[in-house]
Amino acid sequence: MHQKLLKSAHYIELGSYQYWPVLVPRGIRLYTYEQIPVSLKDNPYITDGYRAYLPSRLCIKSLFILSNETVNIWSHLLGFFLFFTLGIYDMTSVLPSASASREDFVICSICLFCFQVCMLCSVGYHLFSCHRSEKTCRRWMALDYAGISIGILGCYVSGVFYAFYCNNYWRQVYLITVLAMILAVFFAQIHPSYLTQQWQRLRPIIFCSVSGYGVIPTLHWVWLNGGVSAPIVQDFAPRVIVMYVIALLAFLFYISKVPERYFPGQLNYLGSSHQIWHVLAVVMLYWWHQSTVYVMQYRHSKPCPDYVSHL
């Protein structure tokens, strides 16, 4: 029996000269970088552990095997359950205890819903990227990109709402601007041309622009509240900075393909840049959720100052 199991096992390398047998269900096999279709060849430093040429049923079944996508899938699947659980907890405990208004419930619901959609789109892509139909793979890739935009939208909606809580005019201006910008990017992402080679360099630029736009309302918010010496600025601005630092760190891992660039073939299953990007994405969204709850409680505990209300 033991020999039969070993015959059906795929041996993976976890560190130098350490090989471990991994059982793979019938109909699924793991491929090397040279064996996979061109559409999957994104990172030459990940040399093994690829799923490919699978029908939908086996794509779903591959959720429970160890491949180079396992951490990517489960990190955001668990991230989805994290934000789903936080949603229930917020609606039943956190918001009622803070005497939250109906608007607070709506904003927090939108924020967490966007985070959950972001997580699920990522899970869907990494689960079905091995589909035998390249068209199906590309559709899921487009949804993955769109999911990132939706996650960014969740950050903007909650951030703008509470930053300009006392400035209804500017709150509406920035919310409409952000919504229009995200919708434009969303429709571009689901267009077939977005995933072509011609757009390869433009895609990260678009994401950086959409994310970096948040600096404009942030600086405006600091000015409206009386500068960096204002208590709310000193309380909340560091949280915004931490979020951007996490996002920048995640993006640097994503584009640099570090650390596997320096250890090709050694980080196929654990510790690759894309896995770090995924974990940092969950950390960033969780941090922003906690910051949103913090500033919401702050807004309910302290009234709007007169010099802000009339601007």
Swiss-Prot record:
It is found in: Golgi apparatus membrane. The keyword Transmembrane applies. Residues 61-71, 299-303 are annotated as: Golgi targeting. InterPro entries: AdipoR/HlyIII-related. Residues 92-104, 167-172, 225-235, 297-311 are lumenal. Residues 1-20 are annotated as: Required for interaction with SREBF2. Coiled coil: none annotated. It is a multi-pass membrane protein. Residues 41-60 are annotated as: Required for interaction with SCAP. Keywords: Golgi apparatus, Membrane, Transmembrane, Transmembrane helix. Residues 1-70, 126-145, 194-203, 257-275 are cytoplasmic. GO terms for molecular function: protein-membrane adaptor activity; ubiquitin-like ligase-substrate adaptor activity. It holds the Pfam family HlyIII. One of its GO terms (biological process) is negative regulation of neuron projection development. Golgi-anchored protein which modulates its interactors acitivies by tethering them to the Golgi apparatus. Functions as a spatial regulator of RAF1 kinase by sequestrating it to the Golgi apparatus. Acts as a positive regulator of cholesterol biosynthesis by mediating the anchoring of the SCAP:SREBP complex in the Golgi apparatus, thereby promoting SCAP:SREBF2 complex formation, potentiating SREBF2 and SREBF1 processing and enhancing lipid synthesis. Belongs to the ADIPOR family. Interacts with SCAP and SREBF2; the interactions are direct, increase in low cholesterol conditions and tether SCAP:SREBP complex to the Golgi apparatus. Interaction with SCAP is mutually exclusive with INSIG1. In hepatocytes, interacts with PPARA and HUWE1; the interactions promote PPARA poylubiquitination and HUWE1-mediated degradation. In macrophages, interacts with PPARG and STUB1; the interactions promote PPARG poylubiquitination and STUB1-mediated degradation. This is Progestin and adipoQ receptor family member 3. It comes from Mus musculus (Mouse).
